[in-house]
């Protein structure tokens, strides 16, 4: 009788604890993971636009959920904000080098919030969208979305980060953690097309602005493709909201500034655009405008992927071939400004090294144009035969008089550097000048 009672008690205990047999008792899980459900249409995206901005913590937590989607190649904490909040980069596609990568960056300015909700909805659509809408797109492009660059600013309702820095003026000097992370993300995904999402105060009937890069240093193929893409977005907004609702971003004192996102990453080699929705509109309408423009970019690149891929590849190939006028920039490890110059170059992903041998080099100073030929073995240099050398020229010659926003230029640091006007034998060395 006792054996029967004990047996019943054990059976009841196992049943109540969720264990249904010996395998469960010994922690062997026989459950089958449910397949991921692709259940959302583009119409759901429009229907779910919020009427008020979403908290930064909710955006972060909800974005983590997309790691379960088979379409998400990587969901990376690419870095952290000044206050330690995770900065999330979501990637779709296997980064096939034969198709372009489209990259969206949301809300460098914390008080321009609509782009974050738009970026989240865009990420959700590609993570959960029905196959007939999403799969044909991801067969033609790779997609990356930096969902929220400045969560600290979003929490505070401020333009700058927790240090009060305007992140969209930090792309040259890279002093802020968020600025460094944006550069790291760009180098990681190597996009053909980059879109920087913002907001503006509004101007009468103008509810949306689009801007292509205007820095003359930009590779001509990249610049041309940027203007084609800009025109397509303007036409798409006009068709939906009416003629006169969208315009080019007006020229300002910073139109050519390399420290601004759209110019900076265009000089690095990516087709580039700026979006701005008008804060004079209802919040939901601002999110809709941002989302509509983002979809317009994606559709345009999907329609002609080779054109945008070729623009990026033209810039890359030029970089690999090098500059046939300035072959390198030479500078001394003993120069007090050199450690900061090396930090900036490295943070931008550029190789640095030293001159191999004592042969003379025909060169001129970047600012005074005074000649110099004697550079000893071990002289520091940054070679120009690498992808993005147009940005090297900007970093090594940028002066504070060129634009009001960049105050960490070689001239301001009193960096002496010489343009090598002939080829230089060199050795790449990531520890260059570390002992000085």
Region spans (language model):
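Secretory targeting signatures
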Residues: 1-28
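M14 metallocarboxypeptidase catalytic domain recognition
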Residues: 19-436
